[in-house]
Structures are given as structure tokens and as C-alpha cells.
Regions:
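Sec-dependent signal peptide recognition
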Residues: 2-9
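Hydrophobic core
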Residues: 10-17
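Secreted/periplasmic proteins
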Residues: 5, 17-141
Length: 141
């Protein structure tokens, strides 16, 4: 019985990982409505992904230097179809793991939490540092 519980516990905490190419997006989208209903802010730790529900918390690691950033999925993009990328990071998130001039980087993407995933936020809310922290409460314990 204890062994089964241990195995189940381990499976629950195994994160889903994928390897992909990432880029960033910023000033041209500043203040505009994102696909999730939030107003985009380039200075917040967010990303655009077509593969994960809004509100999913991801750990994105630059494979070249092993620097990581924790981001929240708040947008979608046409980058996959046009350019073969899996994720676009906010300018702030990208600068945490690479120099802006690099443009495209190879990353590992891990799902950390889907506990606060959502369909759409009405009323054009602004995603703030306080809101970011609220998405991380599940993983901070």
C-alpha cells in the first residue's frame, strides 16, 4: 500500500517536458488585449503558447546557459504556423534567460501547474506582479 502511494505521489509531481524554440514579443503589443482577456504588459513574466491553457505556469529553461524563468500563459500566437516556434516569451521573461539580441533560443518547457487555468478574463484586467504571485502560490506551497 505504501509503495502504491509513493508511486502515485511521484507520478503526480512529474512535470511534462518539451524541447522547443522560443522568441520574445514586446512593445508592439504593449497595452493591447491578449487572447486571454488580459492586457499585455511586456514587463511581466508571461508568455504566449498554443499548447497550454491560459493560466498554466511554465518553467522555461534556456538550453545554452541553463537559466530558467517561471511564466504564466496569457496569450496565443501565430508563431507556430509561421515560424515553427512553440512559445513566445514576454520581453521581461526573455531577458531573464537570454540577451534580447539572440532573438531565438532553444528551450526546455516544463509544466509546473495548471491549478489556476482559465478560459477567458472579462473586463480587460491588467496582469500585475501581485497577480503573478497568486499563480505561484500553488507551487510555493
Amino acid at each position: 500500500m505504501k509503495r502504491k502511494l509513493l508511486i502515485i505521489s511521484m507520478l503526480l509531481f512529474v512535470s511534462i517536458k518539451m524541447f522547443a524554440t522560443a522568441s520574445w514579443y514586446g512593445q508592439d503589443f504593449e497595452g493591447k488585449l491578449s487572447a486571454s482577456g488580459y492586457v499585455y504588459a511586456a514587463n511581466q513574466l508571461t508568455c504566449a503558447s498554443n499548447d497550454h491553457p491560459f493560466g498554466t505556469v511554465l518553467k522555461v529553461t534556456n538550453k545554452a546557459n541553463m537559466k530558467s524563468v517561471i511564466v504564466v500563459v496569457l496569450d496565443r500566437g501565430s508563431f507556430k504556423e509561421k515560424y515553427g516556434r512553440k512559445i513566445d516569451l514576454s520581453k521581461e521573461a526573455f531577458t531573464k534567460i537570454a540577451k534580447i539580441g539572440e532573438g531565438l533560443i532553444n528551450v526546455k518547457i516544463e509544466v509546473i501547474s495548471k491549478a489556476k487555468s482559465f478560459k477567458y478574463k472579462h473586463g480587460k484586467p491588467v496582469f500585475t506582479a501581485k497577480e503573478y504571485d497568486s499563480f505561484l502560490t500553488e507551487i510555493k506551497g
